[in-house]
Structures are given as C-alpha cells and as structure tokens.
Amino acid sequence: MATPSKKTSTPSPQPSKRALPRDPSSEVPSKRKNSAPQLPLLQSSGPFVEGSIVRISMENFLTYDICEVSPGPHLNMIVGANGTGKSSIVCAICLGLAGKPAFMGRADKVGFFVKRGCSRGMVEIELFRASGNLVITREIDVAKNQSFWFINKKSTTQKIVEEKVAALNIQVGNLCQFLPQDKVGEFAKLSKIELLEATEKSIGPPEMHKYHCELKNLREKEKQLETSCKEKTEYLQKMVQRNERYKQDVERFYERKRHLDLIEMLEAKRPWVEYENVRQEYEEVKLVRDRVKEEVRKLKEGQIPVTCRIEEMENERHNLEARIKEKATDIKEASQKCKQKQDVIERKDKHIEELQQALIVKQNEELDRQRRIGNTRKMIEDLQNELKTTENCENLQPQIDAITNDLRRIQDEKALCEGEIIDKRRERETLEKEKKSVDDHIVRFDNLMNQKEDKLRQRFRDTYDAVLWLRNNRDKFKQRVCEPIMLTINMKDNKNAKYIENHIPSNDLRAFVFESQEDMEVFLKEVRDNKKLRVNAVIAPKSSYADKAPSRSLNELKQYGFFSYLRELFDAPDPVMSYLCCQYHIHEVPVGTEKTRERIERVIQETRLKQIYTAEEKYVVKTSFYSNKVISSNTSLKVAQFLTVTVDLEQRRHLEEQLKEIHRKLQAVDSGLIALRETSKHLEHKDNELRQKKKELLERKTKKRQLEQKISSKLGSLKLMEQDTCNLEEEERKASTKIKEINVQKAKLVTELTNLIKICTSLHIQKVDLILQNTTVISEKNKLESDYMAASSQLRLTEQHFIELDENRQRLLQKCKELMKRARQVCNLGAEQTLPQEYQTQVPTIPNGHNSSLPMVFQDLPNTLDEIDALLTEERSRASCFTGLNPTIVQEYTKREEEIEQLTEELKGKKVELDQYRENISQVKERWLNPLKELVEKINEKFSNFFSSMQCAGEVDLHTENEEDYDKYGIRIRVKFRSSTQLHELTPHHQSGGERSVSTMLYLMALQELNRCPFRVVDEINQGMDPINERRVFEMVVNTACKENTSQYFFITPKLLQNLPYSEKMTVLFVYNGPHMLEPNTWNLKAFQRRRRRITFTQPS
C-alpha cells in the first residue's frame, strides 16, 4: 500500500514530473512538441508505417504525474527496474486505444488506473497516418468511473474510437499482437484453437477469420442435417415395415374408402362452388359500378353551363329587387299615413264598442246580483237547519290533552333512539376506516414480501419450493425453523444492503437456519432426499452470539470514517443473527465511508482490522506468516440484488391482531344497530296511532263552531248585496249620447283615408309592374335552379348508387376472400400455397389479384349446390352400409402412409439441402484452408529458423483430428530444447517458464515478419530465460524488428545482459525513478551530454 515515489528522467520539452528519456546513442531524430496547449499533428511520412505510435502522453496515470513518450518507428526497447513504471506505458497504450481494463489483468475498472489521490487522469496516443496523424485522447473520471474520448481534440464516443483503431488493424485484445506482463503466462495457456483464431486475426487477411467462422457455422448445420437425415431414414424404414403387416386389412376397407373419398371431394368442392357463385356476382356488380362511375362523371360535367346561367339571372334579379324596394319605401310611407288614419277610425270604433260593452256588463252585473241574493238566502236556511240538528258538543279537551302528553313522551324516546343510531353509525364508519387502513398496510407488507419471494423463486427455485413445503409442514419440527436468511433479514436502510450481500455468500443467504440438529435432518431428508431439491441448511449456535459485543467500541473507529458495524445495519431473528455473528463475525466488521477509503493506509496500519468496508470497496487485511508484513487486498462491491426490499414481520403480526379486534367491534356495533332500529320502528307505529286519535277528536270539537261562523258570514254578505243597487235606464241614455258624437268624428276621418288610398294604389300598380318583371326573371332562374337541383339530385342518387354498388362490391370481395380462405382450408392449402399443375382444371381470377385452382377431380363432380347436396346425401347413405370394419386400423395405416410420404419428401429436401451445404463448405474451405496452410507454413519456416539458430528445434503446424471439424482446427507449437528429447507440444505444464517465454517470443517474432498490424507490444517476456537463450532471443528481436518495412515493436524488459548487439534503427528508452531525480523542467539533455563527455575525456587512459 506504499505510495509510489515521484519519477523523473531525461529532459522533455513538455514539463512533467516523470518522463522517459531517449538513449543518446540510439535516438532517432523526430520532431518533439512544445508546451503549447494546442499541438499540431505530426505529418512526417518517414519510416513509420500506417497506424504506428508516434507519441504517448500520460497525466495522473498509475505512477506518473505527467509523462510523454516518443517511440521510434522500429524496435523500441523500454528498460527500467521493477516498479519504475514500464508496464504503465503498456497500460496507457491499451487503454488509450479503447482496450478493456480487464485485459491488462490488473483491475476491472478504468478508475483504478488513475494515480492514487487524483480525481482525473488522461492518456493520449498519437498514431501515424499518411493523410494526417490521428490523436486519440481518453480522459478518466475516478468518481464516476467514466471515460471521455476525443479524436484530434474533438469530443467523440468510444465506439467511433474503436472503429478508427480497428480500421488501422490494431487489436489490443489479441495476445499475438499485444502481450502485457500479466498476460505472458496466459499465452502458453492458449489452446490450439484459440491460438489459431488469434493468429488469423493478427496476420491473416481480413476475410480469413470470416471464412473460418462461416465454415464452423456451415459444418454445425451440416452435422444437424446429417443427424436429421439419419433419424428420419431409420424412422421411415420402421413405418414402411409396420404398414406392410396391415396391408391386407386395409384393402378390404377400400370400397368404403372410395365412397368416403367421394364425400370428401364433394365437401371440398362445395365451398369452391359457393365461391364461384359469389365471384360471378362480384364481377356483375363490378361492371355495373364502373358504368355508374362513368355516369357520375358525365353528370358533373353537364352542370357547369347551368351554374353560369343561374349566376347571370341572379344579378338581374338583384337589380329589379332594388327598384322594387324603392317603390316599396314610397308605398310604405303612404301606407303609414293610411294606417294612422285607419288607426284613429279603429280607436273610435273601439270606443263605441267599449261604451256598448260597459252597458252590457252593468246589465249582467245586476242580473248576477239578484241571482246571488237568492242563493245566499237558501244557503243560510240550509246552515240554520243543520245547526239545529247538531247535538251539543261534549267536553273532549281532557282526552286531547292526554293524547298530546303521550305524543310528547314518544317523540322524546324517538329522538333518544335516533341519537343512539347516529352514534352507532359514526362508530361503525370509524371502525371501517380503521379496518381499511390496516388492510392497506397488510397489503403493502404482503407486496414487499412477495417481491422478496419472487426474487428467491427466479434465482433459486429449489429453495423457493422448499419454503412453500416448510410453511405447510411446520408441525413436523420440534424447535424454531427460520426461512432462508435472505427472506428473514430486513435492512434498516436499503442502501446498505450491498455490504451484507458482499459479506455473506449467496449459499448462506439462501440457507434455512435450524436450532436443532434433529429438525435439520428431518428437513433435509424430506426436501433433499425425497423431493430432490438442492437446498442449504445451517444450525445456529447453542449459545446465542446475537448480542455479543464487538472487540472495540465504534466510537474509537469514527475518526476513520466508520459509522456502523455490519450487525447494526439490519434486523433478523435471533437464530439467524446468532449464526451470522458466529460464522461471519458481523459484529466485528465495521462499515466506513469515502473518508475511510481516503485514509485506508492509516486505517490498516493503526486499527489492525481484518475486514473493512468503505463506500464502494471491501478490504481484506492479512499478516504474512513469514515476514509479519501486513498484506491487504481490495475488491469493488457488487450491487445488491436480494436485500433491497425490507419487511417488518413483527409489525405485520401486530396489524393482524389489530384487524381481528376491529372485526369483533364491528359485529358488536351491527348487533346494537339492529336492536335500535326495531325500537325506532315500534315507536313510529305508536306515534301514528296517537296522531290519528287526536285528529278525530279535534274534528268533532270544531264542527259546531264552524257552522255558526258560516251563518254569520253569509248574513253579512246578503246585506251588502242588497245595498249594492244600479239605475239601468240612466246608464243607457248616457251611452247613446256619447256614441252619436263619436260617429260624426269618424265620418270626417273616412274621407281623408279615401284620398290616401288612391295615392297608395297608384304606387302599388308601379310596384306590381316591376314585380312581374322580377317574377319572370325569378321564374326563369327557378326553372334553371330546378333543372340544376334535379340534375344534382340525379347526381346524388347516382353517386349514392355508386357508393352502394362499391360497398356491395367490397362486401362481395370480402365474402370471396372468406369463401376462398374456407375453400383453401378445406383443401389444406396454405396462404401462399398453390395446387400442382397436374391437378388443375381451371384458374379462376380472385378479386384480390391472387390465383387459385380447382383440382382436376372436381370436373367430374356436379357444378351446382343442389346437385352436390343430393349426391352427398346419396354417398353418405351408401357409406353407412359398410359395417364391421375397424376404422382405427385404416386410420393408423393412412396416417402412416401420409407420414411415409411426408418423411420421404422431407428426406429428399434434407438431402438436397445437405448437398448444398456440402458444396458451400467445399467452396469456403478451399478459400480458407489453402491460404491458411500457406500462412502456417510461412510461420513454421520463420519459427523453425529461429529455433535452429538457437541449436534447438521447433515447428508450427495446422492441427486437427478430423478435417471436417472446422471448430477443432488449431495451431500446434512443438519445441525441443535438448537434443536428447523429442518435440513436445508447448503447454503451461510441460516446459519451464523460461522455455515458454522463449517459445512465445519466437512465435511472436515469426508473426512479426508476416504481420499486418502496425505495432506489437511484448512486456517482460524474457523473465525466466537463461542468459544464453535471452541473448539469442534478443539478437533475433533486434534483427527482425529493425528490418525495412516492418511494423513497430515495443520490447519491455527490467534487465539487460552485457555486450548485447544493438541496431541504429532501434530506440532505447530508459525509465528511472527515485526521490532524488531532477524535475523534468530542470533536466537538460545537451548539458548532460557535455558533462558526460568532459568526464570521459578527463579520465586517465
């Protein structure tokens, strides 16, 4: 857990805390970038090949603060002691070119590659392209564990970066091209098949791996077809043999079968005849519909000139109506004057009528008064007679008072009863609300529990089935049995569920917890042995650990960011909690925060805790048995899956008890309501009886008083009527005088009115003349409009007729389709299936454009529905005469015959398909295998030469046990390092580590001269080699990687032998570190060279 020291090296134009210098003796001239933020892309077309790495920049990456590496175009040897940061450059190449973090074998999250204590890091790779260099930048955010990508300083996505990298044939995930330090051992573990695939992708043409994959798919389908053909052939032979045994019995059935076949053909033809009848009707309707459509078009064209003429007549009508309106205005004025005179005359007439009417009214009033006086006298006489006959009224008031008191008492009782009913109703409503609230709470609890059980059922079905069995059989156990731990645990805060799930293995999370060994044996015998369910069971400790105190107080740990022990994060039954404390020490494992992770080194050193949880990681701390050093490892926490749902079972039981109490109270309230309603009903009945008695007594008491009041009232009315008299003769004289005066005034007004009528008549004559002209115009216009309306009506009728015909056509078309579908179903034809030509007699056209056909045998059958129905009846009668035959045998025989025919056809089709697959395989195999053999032969030649130069033997061949199993093809590497042994296949176990490293290196060098990739990376491949082999391998690497037109090569090593041969084309990059290194901005390469030369020159010879 020690923090890496700052690394420095030779000067670099860009300031940095760590940089890689060039060896002055082997430095290849190149243009270096200055420190400006916007850097121009390198456009050099020197010895670099397309896709080679020109520059690598890192900021806050692993051990580096800031570093820039400028590799050469050929062999780049990166040298440095272990831990200086050589492999960090390899990681930068991988991650910078969109490689997966897990491929490096160091961490599975990209955030772990950022230098500790930094929140962001950056890797930038510049790749050579003739059209302009490609600069790929990857910025890493530690908090989000997220990357941000840029191409030539422009934001982009990882997918586009991967496409750009793939276009340059760069495969950072291929061990034949990119072999990091942690993957060197895995190369030897590659199977022959994996090695072939990696080699194809690395140096083969692009289509080679595609052909190989296509061959594997074709071969797999060929095997399936071969197996299918073999199975169908064997089954077909069995079916034929079985039918031969029943042939004699079936022949006796043929006569009956002939009739049944004819019935079947008749039933099959019947829907075709129905279809043909409807189709002919459809064709007839379609012809009529087309004729009507043409008629509609002609009617619409004929209406255009009529419309124009109507508009002309309308304009003329407007002019005449304007003149008529002027005359009407003059007439209106004259008529108004006439009206005024006439109104005055009418008022005079009305006045005379009113005088006459007033006189008549007075006459009628006098007659009515005399009649009313007579009627009143007779009524008084009748009332007096009735009063005499009425008996003296007895004293009824005491009885009325007694009934009134009884009514008041009953009303009080009713009010009291109604109040109690209202109280009961309110009490019941309150209880119902409480019941609904409790029911809702229980439903929510059940939903949460169902969620947990659904997760258990989906992931561990056997455990779920065992839970159901346990719930139905708890009586078989003597002591308490807890359901699986994941169901009984309830998190206090769901966000902490990840700590529990990462701490307790899933096998124990789904385990049942028992308090008794005997109970557990009963359970396992029933569930595991009898029901064959795979379940886990554990026993809780006899003495409870649930309340055991931790070894140190949480207050001591809060300074490091710890907020709780695991035990305090959840609730569980005592047996479960006791088991977890005993088995997993959850009372001793603290949970911290991000603050804990930031101080993790201090926490580990000072607390000596064995297990620690931070916000997102788990740390396991151990002490070395030999060196007593503290060793820690950390893993990222997995997301919680099971414990995020929390159910409080104790609270649910409390709610169920509460619900039972509410039900009991509701029953008591309902009983009280029934009794109160009966009491209220009885009181209501008694109240009605008393009111009726009181009403009868009051009527008897008030009758005499009413008669006396009526007689007194009538006598007063009679006196008033006798006093109200009228003089009719005087009234008649006054009315006659007033009428004469009014008639004189009326005669004068009539003369004035006559003169005004003459003027008005003249104006009317002039207006009538204009109206006649307008009428002529309107008549002509109306005639045109009538013709237009008639034509429009005819058009609407024709259009309606067209719509009806079109709807009928659609209906018939749909019916045709339905009949055709039914007919095809009867003939067992699919939607797109047609009958063979030899069974067709005619091809009627279906309205939807498809064609169908009638079987040839139909032509010998009747062509009308009546004839078909008659023949069907006859044939059915004949078929029913055949008895005593076993239809089951015939059905089985026929079914087998059909299956035999179907299998024969299927077998033919399968064989044809199989031949096609074999032909395709042959073609693809030729395109794939021949180039592959040539490629492997070239690899073998290079590989053998390299081994021969080392006085060893090695060969590479294309290996397969069966030439047809294309998924089993592989590249086999066989090596021999001693003359006394035979060639042995390269495996992780047979050869030593150094021998595997030599073999791996030489194989990669063999690929180097054939490779299409722009660069190759090999990290610390020489570890474990003896000095002789290491020297030989190094010489071959230099010779191979420094040839003209070869791809770029990165060779990372922590050590070098003395007096190794070097090439002018290779680049040596040294990696230094240490607390006393100079800062990059103070490093001056030229000054260092000058001082070095002075020291060399001044040394005594």
Swiss-Prot record:
Region (Disordered): 1-43
Major location (coarse): nucleus
Cellular compartments annotated: Nucleus; Chromosome; Nucleus, PML body; Chromosome, Telomere
Coiled-coil segments on the chain, per record: 207-445, 647-828, 888-927
Annotated tissue distribution: Widely expressed. Strongly expressed in testis.
A Pfam family annotated for this UniProt entry: AAA_23
Keyword Kinase: no
Composition skew (Low complexity), residue ranges: 1-17
The record's account of how the chain is modified after translation: Sumoylated.
Protein's GO biological process: cell division; cellular senescence; chromatin looping; chromosome condensation; chromosome segregation; DNA damage response; double-strand break repair via homologous recombination; mitotic cell cycle phase transition
One GO MF term: single-stranded DNA binding
Annotated positions binding ATP: 80-87
Alphabetized InterPro entries for the sequence: P-loop_NTPase (IPR027417), Rad50/SbcC_AAA (IPR038729)
Family classification: Belongs to the SMC family. SMC5 subfamily.
Complex formation: Forms a heterodimer with SMC6. Component of the SMC5-SMC6 complex which consists at least of SMC5, SMC6, NSMCE2, NSMCE1, NSMCE4A or EID3 and NSMCE3. Interacts with NSMCE2. Interacts with SLF2; this interaction induces an association of the SLF1-SLF2 complex with the SMC5-SMC6 complex. Interacts with RAD18; this interaction is increased in a SLF1 or SLF2-dependent manner. (Microbial infection) SMC5-SMC6 complex interacts with Hepatitis B X protein.
Function of the protein: Core component of the SMC5-SMC6 complex, a complex involved in repair of DNA double-strand breaks by homologous recombination. The complex may promote sister chromatid homologous recombination by recruiting the SMC1-SMC3 cohesin complex to double-strand breaks. The complex is required for telomere maintenance via recombination in ALT (alternative lengthening of telomeres) cell lines and mediates sumoylation of shelterin complex (telosome) components which is proposed to lead to shelterin complex disassembly in ALT-associated PML bodies (APBs).
Domain notes: The flexible hinge domain, which separates the large intramolecular coiled coil regions, allows the heterotypic interaction with the corresponding domain of SMC6, forming a V-shaped heterodimer.
Protein name in the entry: Structural maintenance of chromosomes protein 5
Organism for this UniProt entry: Homo sapiens (Human)
Gene: SMC5
